[in-house]
């Protein structure tokens, strides 16, 4: 089949590679426009755009995928289907109606759980033992379409959102190809989502990524892992903001937010137990071990994170 892949971040690259290796023909790639990034605010292409250029594929980068210029280009490409992986913008009805088999979205949750932009992050922060991914038929509602295929993936006790996304992206790419094969063969069967079990996964805000030291050690661990690598869990010390890396819950009793520096570890108190702090990254600087940070900063007895 003729395909136009819609995707933007690194997590969508495995799907593009899998489609290029399949018997289907990727005739173009739809991705978000180049965006300013870094200290110099230079225009940077998305990971999918870079991979598409390497493969010599035509790129579509509209500000919104509903303009007449984009719709005309899509109609001219005449795709049979448009697979989607983390594209980053809503697709309007006019575009949904162009391919004869519609748009097939690889979503990183077991729908109807965690509909929205941050399903993996929300699953980790919620303490889910299992998550997964599914391929569903895109429609105008938010992740509401019928599901063609799905698979489960356990959430390990130290898994970050980034760890899970990497695994789901690779396995999901293969499932996406299988669904497209079934559609082409006429054997595909999509099942409507159940009305029960719906949960929403809006994008994680910067404020949500702030560590609440009045939470339990387990809750803080989940929040840090769910916000890794993006947007990054953070806290403040002496009025300065910085990111904190992996933490390990331990039973040691330390007052909430209090910093306890030991010879080989740095503890931070919580509402229940404490956490061993792994890394610290001050604004504009590289990440460093918590012990190195403590040696340089020298927290005084009784000082706290806030």
From Swiss-Prot:
<dbReference type="GO" id="GO:0005829">
    <property type="term" value="C:cytosol"/>
</dbReference>
<dbReference type="GO" id="GO:0004479">
    <property type="term" value="F:methionyl-tRNA formyltransferase activity"/>
</dbReference>
<protein>
    <recommendedName>
        <fullName>Methionyl-tRNA formyltransferase</fullName>
        <ecNumber>2.1.2.9</ecNumber>
    </recommendedName>
</protein>
<keyword id="KW-0648">Protein biosynthesis</keyword>
<dbReference type="Pfam" id="PF02911">
    <property type="entry name" value="Formyl_trans_C"/>
</dbReference>
<keyword id="KW-0808">Transferase</keyword>
<feature type="region of interest" description="Disordered">
    <location>
        <begin position="287"/>
        <end position="306"/>
    </location>
</feature>
<comment type="function">
    <text>Attaches a formyl group to the free amino group of methionyl-tRNA(fMet). The formyl group appears to play a dual role in the initiator identity of N-formylmethionyl-tRNA by promoting its recognition by IF2 and preventing the misappropriation of this tRNA by the elongation apparatus.</text>
</comment>
<dbReference type="InterPro" id="IPR002376">
    <property type="entry name" value="Formyl_transf_N"/>
</dbReference>
<feature type="binding site">
    <location>
        <begin position="109"/>
        <end position="112"/>
    </location>
    <ligand>
        <name>(6S)-5,6,7,8-tetrahydrofolate</name>
    </ligand>
</feature>
<dbReference type="Pfam" id="PF00551">
    <property type="entry name" value="Formyl_trans_N"/>
</dbReference>
<dbReference type="InterPro" id="IPR036477">
    <property type="entry name" value="Formyl_transf_N_sf"/>
</dbReference>
<dbReference type="InterPro" id="IPR041711">
    <property type="entry name" value="Met-tRNA-FMT_N"/>
</dbReference>
<comment type="similarity">
    <text>Belongs to the Fmt family.</text>
</comment>
<dbReference type="InterPro" id="IPR011034">
    <property type="entry name" value="Formyl_transferase-like_C_sf"/>
</dbReference>
<dbReference type="InterPro" id="IPR005793">
    <property type="entry name" value="Formyl_trans_C"/>
</dbReference>
<dbReference type="InterPro" id="IPR044135">
    <property type="entry name" value="Met-tRNA-FMT_C"/>
</dbReference>
<dbReference type="InterPro" id="IPR005794">
    <property type="entry name" value="Fmt"/>
</dbReference>
């Amino acid at each position: 089949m003729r395909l136009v892949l819609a995707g933007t971040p690194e997590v969508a690259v495995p799907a593009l590679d899998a489609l290029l290796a399949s018997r289907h023909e990727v005739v173009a790639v739809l991705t978000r426009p180049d965006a300013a990034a870094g200290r110099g605010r230079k225009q940077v292409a998305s990971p999918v755009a870079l991979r598409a250029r390497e493969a010599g594929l035509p790129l579509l980068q509209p500000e919104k995928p509903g303009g007449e210029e984009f719709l005309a280009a899509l109609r001219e490409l005449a795709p049979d289907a448009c697979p989607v992986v983390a594209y980053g913008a809503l697709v309007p009805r006019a575009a949904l109606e162009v391919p004869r088999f519609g748009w097939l979205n690889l979503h990183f949750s077991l729908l109807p759980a965690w509909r929205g932009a941050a399903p993996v992050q929300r699953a980790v922060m919620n303490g889910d033992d299992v998550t997964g991914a599914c391929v569903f038929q895109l429609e105008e509602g938010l992740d509401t379409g019928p599901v063609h295929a799905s698979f489960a993936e356990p959430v390990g006790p130290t898994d970050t959102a980034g760890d899970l996304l990497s695994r789901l992206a690779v396995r999901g790419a293969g499932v996406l190809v299988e669904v497209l094969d079934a559609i082409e063969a006429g054997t595909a069967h999509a099942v409507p989502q159940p009305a029960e079990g719906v949960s929403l996964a809006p994008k994680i805000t910067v404020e949500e990524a702030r560590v609440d030291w009045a939470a339990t050690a387990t809750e803080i661990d989940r929040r840090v892992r769910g916000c890794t690598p993006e947007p990054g869990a953070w806290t403040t010390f002496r009025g300065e903001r910085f990111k904190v890396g992996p933490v390990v819950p331990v039973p040691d009793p330390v007052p909430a937010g209090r910093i306890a520096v030991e010879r080989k570890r740095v503890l931070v108190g919580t509402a229940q137990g404490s956490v061993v702090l792994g890394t610290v990254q001050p604004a504009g600087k590289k990440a460093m071990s918590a012990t190195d940070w403590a040696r340089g900063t020298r927290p005084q007895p009784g000082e706290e994170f806030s």
